[in-house]
C-alpha cells in the first residue's frame, strides 16, 4: 500500500468536492471561529500546496500502470478476498488504519500492486535470465553490522579459527548462526546482488573478504558448487527467482515506475504542479 496520508487527503478532497456541489463561490466558508474564517478557496489551496504533487504522482502512476499492464478482475478480486479472509471482522478497521475510504479504494490499490508485479515480470529479458545462468552453490556466512568487526573476523579465520564456531558466536543472522552460518544451496538471483557476486567468485573452501550489502557486512565461505544443469532445464526457475527478487526490491520498483512514467509522455497543464514528476518520488508500494 502507498503512503497513508495520500488516501486521507484524497478522502478530504472528495468530501470537499461533494460539499461544494452547487457552490461556485470560492469565498464560501468551510469553517468559522470567533475571529476566524476558512474559505473554500483557501482550504483547497492549502490542500493542493501540501499534497497536490504527491496526489498527482499517485493518481497518474496508477492510471499509467494499470492501463498498460492489464490485470484480470478475477485476479484482483481473489487478492481482495484473500485479505478479507485473513482479517475477518477487522477488515474495515484495517482499511481505516490505512486511510482507505472503502473496499473499492482498497481494490484499486491491489490492482495497482498486481499491475506493478506484471510490469516487473515483463522487465525480465532473456539476457537477464542468461546472465544468471550459473551453477547452484552452497555457502555459509557470518553477518555483522560493523566493517571493522568483519575485518577482525576475517583475520581470525585467516589465522585458523573455525568458521562454524565464529558464525555461532558472532553472526547477527539469526536464521543461520546456529547452523554455523550455513545458508544451504541457492541459485543465482536468490541472494542480494553484492553477496552473490562475491560468492560466485570463490572457489570451494575459499573465504571472502568482508562484503557490504543492505543487511550489513558478510564474510562468506563457499562450501560446494554443483555441476551446471542444461539451460532449458533451469531457465524458468531462474526467471521466477528474478521476479521474486525484483518484486521485493523497493529501489527497483521505484526505478521501473519512474521509467514507465517517463515513457508515458506526461504533460501537466497546472503550473503549480508542473515539476511533480521531477521533484516527487513515489511513497512506496
From Swiss-Prot:
Annotated signal sequence is 1-20
Task: Using the UniProt record, give the first listed, main subcellular location.
Answer: membrane
Per the record, lipidation of type S-diacylglycerol cysteine is found at 21
Question: Is Signal one of the keywords?
Answer: yes
Q: Where is the lipid attached (N-palmitoyl cysteine)?
A: 21
Its GO CC terms are: plasma membrane
Q: Name one Pfam family in it.
A: Rotamase
The yes or no answer to whether the keyword Ribosomal protein is present is no
Q: Which SUPFAM superfamilies match?
A: FKBP-like, Triger factor/SurA peptide-binding domain-like
Q: Name one GO biological process term.
A: protein folding
Annotated membrane topology: Lipid-anchor
EC top class, as a word: isomerase
> What EC number(s) is this enzyme filed under?
5.2.1.8
- Give me the reactions it catalyses: [protein]-peptidylproline (omega=180) = [protein]-peptidylproline (omega=0)
Per UniProt, which keywords does this protein have?
A: Cell membrane, Isomerase, Lipoprotein, Membrane, Palmitate, Rotamase, Signal
What subcellular compartments does it reside in?
A: Cell membrane
Quote the HAMAP family the UniProt record gives.
Foldase_PrsA
Relate the protein's function as given in its record. Plays a major role in protein secretion by helping the post-translocational extracellular folding of several secreted proteins.
Report the protein name in the record: Foldase protein PrsA 2
Amino acid at each position: 500500500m502507498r503512503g497513508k496520508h495520500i488516501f486521507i487527503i484524497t478522502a478530504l478532497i472528495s468530501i470537499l468536492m461533494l460539499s461544494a456541489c452547487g457552490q461556485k463561490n470560492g469565498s464560501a466558508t468551510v469553517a468559522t471561529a470567533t475571529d476566524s474564517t476558512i474559505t473554500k478557496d483557501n482550504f483547497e489551496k492549502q490542500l493542493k500546496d501540501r499534497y497536490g504533487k504527491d496526489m498527482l504522482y499517485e493518481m497518474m502512476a496508477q492510471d499509467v500502470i494499470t492501463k498498460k499492464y492489464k490485470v484480470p478482475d478475477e485476479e484482483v478480486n481473489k487478492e481482495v478476498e484473500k485479505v478479507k479472509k485473513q482479517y475477518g471482522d477487522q477488515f474495515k478497521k484495517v482499511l481505516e488504519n490505512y486511510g482507505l475510504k472503502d473496499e473499492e479504494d482498497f481494490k484499486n490499490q491491489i490492482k495497482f500492486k498486481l499491475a506493478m508485479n506484471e510490469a516487473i515480470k515483463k522487465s525480465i529479458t532473456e539476457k537477464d535470465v542468461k546472465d544468471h545462468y550459473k551453477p547452484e552453490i552452497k555457502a555459509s556466512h557470518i553477518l555483522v553490522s560493523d566493517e571493522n568487526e568483519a575485518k577482525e573476523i576475517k583475520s581470525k579465520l585467516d589465522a585458523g579459527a573455525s568458521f562454524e564456531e565464529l558464525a555461532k558466536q558472532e553472526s547477527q543472522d539469526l536464521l543461520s548462526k546456529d547452523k554455523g552460518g550455513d545458508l544451504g544451496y541457492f541459485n543465482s538471483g536468490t541472494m542480494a546482488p553484492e553477496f552473490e557476486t562475491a560468492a560466485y567468485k570463490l572457489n570451494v573452501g575459499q573465504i571472502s573478504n568482508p562484503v557490504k550489502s543492505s543487511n550489513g557486512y558478510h564474510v562468506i565461505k563457499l562450501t560446494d558448487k554443483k555441476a551446471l544443469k542444461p539451460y532449458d532445464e533451469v531457465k524458468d526457475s531462474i526467471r521466477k527467482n528474478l521476479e521474486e527478487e525484483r518484486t521485493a526490491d523497493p529501489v527497483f520498483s521505484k526505478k521501473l515506475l519512474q521509467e514507465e512514467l517517463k515513457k508515458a509522455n506526461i504533460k501537466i497543464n497546472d503550473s503549480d504542479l508542473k515539476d511533480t514528476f521531477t521533484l516527487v518520488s513515489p511513497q512506496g508500494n
